[in-house]
Amino acid sequence: MVKVALKAKNLLRILARKNKSQNWLAYRMEISSGYMSQLITGARRPSPKMRERFLQVLDGVAFDELFEIRESNGRKR
């Protein structure tokens, strides 16, 4: 099984470069700030729909810059 994880450090760098906050991103993605926090800390993994929203809201950011694909055994692909 393949899992997709958010690269939280990269996301935070991207937000800093854009001078935007996690709350701004949560608002633009139409999710709660609590859910955004869970995505960033790794408590939750982004669904395909959430991944699509990240890429739409953070226009110009590549998939591989934000997400990491892992096999169920934890290895990176």
Where are these regions (language model features)?
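Short, charged recognition helix plus adjacent turn
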Residues: 1-3, 33, 64-77
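A short, Lys/Arg-rich alpha-helix, primarily the initiator
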Residues: 1-21
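Short, basic-rich loop-to-helix N-cap that marks the start of a DNA-contacting helix
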Residues: 43-56
